[in-house]
Amino acid sequence: MKKILLIGTGGTIASKEMGDGLTPELAAKEIVSYVPEVQNLCAIEVLQLCNIDSTNMHPKIWTELAKAVQKNFDRYDGFVVLHGTDTMAYTSAALSYMIQHSRKPIVVTGSQQPIDREGTDARVNLRDSILYAMDEYSENVVLVFDGNVIAGTRAKKMQARSFNAFQSVNFPVLARVQDGRIIRYLPYIPEREPVRFYTEISDSVCVFKLIPGTRPELLSYLFANYDCVGMESFGVGGIPDALLDTVYQAMQKWKEAGKFLVMATQVMNEGSNMEIYRVGQKVKKDFQLIEAYDMTLEAVVTKLMVLLKRYGSSYEELQKAFYAEVNHDILCAFPEQ
């Protein structure tokens, strides 16, 4: 019988109405008791890591999660992480970079309604996640929700309240869990490299979303206080003329100091390509800017957090590692440009 470790972190799935709003109260051991049928499918053991609203998720907890999987990796056949939906995409992306080449599945799931509520989606999501974690062809970090199995680096929350809360961005859904069966859409290619854990990460990463009329002094502040800024630009990517002087003044100092600017787009689908327009092409070539292409923002942020800790001040090494595909995170990068 397969052994699955259920790791509780809180979220809506663990919440109860406390008079001043839903609050995580149920432990993972209590949650699994709502789906007693899974006890006949596998041996489930429980680890309660924390019990928080996922709005309060923090990189320190990602480190604790990754270390918990590392410590128990040889003891279990799969792992299921119970999590709130609001930051679930960040956590599934972070774990994808912190636990690479895992032949064992690490499934992140939760629900839009508490598990003790009538008509909740929690029981189905938990059952589907355990079924997927038991399967011999499952591996690496995935997010399972509303029957969809999404690569951990490609998930994004698209609905605030509906059960079909998550979509896979710029990459196909890996599989569906339906009526107790797993329907896979991609051919199975087993991991051949040994599992690697990168449990230490940097939180010196900031996202800066451009709006028409953005003030240059905001960039100066971010450049002074963070080691990496992910800039969400417009369309396929570019920097407004009003910001160019600030960017040019800062970039050389940044590279010398081992700091980084990564360009992304506010447009969710199809990704960036700074080579198309003048507002993007020149600054990218002048400074060999790192570009996010078709990655999700959650993947960009968490990948940078992991890489900053691994490569420190080496711009070339970090750029090379950023463009290296991890768990289907980037498909259209052209690092030679």
Region annotations inferred by a language model:
Residues I7-T9, V81-H83, V107-G110, V142-D146, ...:
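Short beta-strand segments
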Residues K16-D20, S92-A93, E118-D121, A151-K157, ...:
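Short acidic, glycine/serine/threonine-rich loops at helix termini
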Residues V236-Q337:
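C-terminal non-catalytic interaction/assembly regions of soluble proteins
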Residues V108-Q178:
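Internal gly/pro-rich beta-alpha loop/helix module
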